[in-house]
């Protein structure tokens, strides 16, 4: 209700008539749109809404940011992430797509789905897992969560993170590559049995570096357009971002571990992960860390009740003595 009734001037209640009315800790009161404007010496011109008259958000709430948009290298088009659904359909679906907006024509194309695509009807009384939207036939139409597009340096391809299934928020993020010349898509990290997080194109426009978790550590990997995946780093740490540095021979990254907070590193990739050079550039918390005594962190593998191997991280006290007994704090996730 935009205006309180005259007899209830202090009322703070809300009249909810449809989903989705809330994201985590905030009510849906605005619909963000990206705008294009010229920046001149005289100031900024009036912006052009690239989603004009569309009731859909970009970036997507609640966590989306500028990473959900990308300029093409020739500056003639913009790729953006959007879930063009509303009401109950919006609230129960994770089906977002990557769209290409042409600046000259103001035309938009969905890169995930064929022209004229109509999604199978959704029965909200049943699990999405067993519905037509997640059938083998429809999975080729990217019914899952597609986000964060990035153009190749030569502008011939675009890559993004892609989940296979609609309604499954914990699905595996794969790397999808779209070829503008052929209009075809391919998934180049199918051989990597884990999640693809941040990624960047290399200067050759044929290789993509990405970060992914394996056995409790987040390292760097690379993949080519054939689907081959190779490990770049082998650290007992977590890389949380990656971008191209220098002339394209090095990578700029943020890295953290259970013993150190975020700092900026430069990585020089080699064919074997053990030979890649990882150089720390910043030591933002050096003074604070110098005053702390941190315990050793070790990994252990234990057998579960069903005979499988489970990874356990053990963080020892800073003054650990193996001849003494210590109370233990067990954290399960």
Question: What is each residue range found by the language model?
Answer:
Residues 85-88, 164-168, 214-217, 257-260:
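Short glycine/acidic-enriched loop and turn motifs that connect beta-strands
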Residues 78, 155-158, 208, 232, ...:
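Hydrophobic beta-strand positions that form the internal "hydrophobic ladder"
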